[in-house]
């Protein structure tokens, strides 16, 4: 401890160097968080047979750029599209530990229909639809932190504060989902899903936008043509994909 003053003196001897170093460290952690989000996003989009008819549609410029919900009916009208869902990365933090929870805001009914690999009793699916502040949590995550249905779950968002400026959110646990097989079960260790309507109304940055759209096509043979049709539909618009 007797050298502490020397450390601080050295740090602030060249303030520009210190600031740039701190910014570099911050950027590294930010990049890690964003890339972890991308990994969770595509992992939760499915693997194997269940994912052979699902596309992820995102903004062409960057996965961090959101898309307007006005695109929804246009996506649904594209030939070969069977169903469309969406999600927004929430940036959840539990118990002051960053990157330990991957939280997404989703439309409950569409999410449950498009992602059957997440197994949950029907009454819990309905509770998720009916509870504005509802959240469903992965089985392994619930076991890890001792979460139970009926609990209040406090989460912070490092991206989306509420309209009152607070980064602290509180949700009601209404369901616990498991994976359809061992691969999906492993992914329940850190995933949670919140009701999109509540998030959309309460977040400070406005409503009516999704991070990505999940598009289910009618047949695996249509994947390439539907993807091309989506890109063509929004080409030269403000929302290129």
Give residue spans per PLM region.
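Alpha-helical membrane and juxtamembrane elements of multi-pass inner-membrane transport
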Residues: 1-5, 9, 40, 55, ...
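N-terminal Sec/SRP start-transfer signal
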Residues: 1-31
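Amphipathic alpha-helical segments that mediate coupling or scaffolding at interfaces
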Residues: 10-11, 45, 216, 233
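Hydrophobic, regular-secondary-structure patches
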Residues: 26-104, 108, 120-131, 143, ...
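Extracytoplasmic
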Residues: 52-54, 70, 96-101, 130-132, ...
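Soluble periplasmic/extracytoplasmic beta-strand elements of cell-envelope proteins
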Residues: 54-58, 85, 100-105, 134-136, ...
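Mechanotransmission and gating elements of multispan inner-membrane complexes involved in transport
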Residues: 78, 98, 141, 159-241
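Diglycine-centered glycine-rich loop/turn motifs
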Residues: 111-137, 142-143, 148-155, 183
């Amino acid at each position: 401890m007797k050298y502490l003053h020397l450390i601080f003196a050295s740090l602030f001897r060249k303030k520009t160097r210190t600031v740039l170093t701190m910014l570099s460290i911050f950027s590294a952690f930010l990049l890690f968080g964003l890339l972890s989000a991308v990994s969770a996003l595509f992992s939760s989009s499915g693997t194997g047979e269940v994912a052979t008819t699902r596309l992820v549609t995102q903004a062409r410029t960057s996965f961090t750029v959101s898309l307007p919900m006005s695109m929804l009916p246009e996506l649904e009208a594209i030939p070969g599209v069977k169903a469309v869902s969406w999600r927004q990365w929430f940036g959840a933090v539990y118990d002051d530990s960053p990157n330990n929870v991957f939280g997404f805001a989703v439309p409950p009914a569409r999410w449950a229909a498009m992602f059957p690999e997440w197994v949950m009793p029907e009454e819990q699916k309905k509770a998720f639809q009916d509870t504005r502040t509802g959240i469903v949590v992965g089985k392994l995550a619930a076991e890890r932190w001792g979460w139970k249905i009926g609990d209040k779950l406090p989460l912070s968002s490092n991206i989306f504060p509420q309209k009152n400026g607070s980064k602290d959110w509180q949700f009601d646990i209404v369901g616990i989902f498991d994976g359809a097989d061992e691969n999906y079960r492993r992914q329940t260790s850190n995933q949670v899903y919140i009701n999109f309507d509540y998030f959309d109304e309460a977040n400070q940055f406005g409503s009516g936008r999704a991070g990505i759209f999940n598009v289910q096509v009618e047949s695996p043979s249509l994947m390439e043509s539907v993807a091309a049709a989506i890109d063509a539909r929004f080409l030269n618009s403000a929302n290129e994909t």
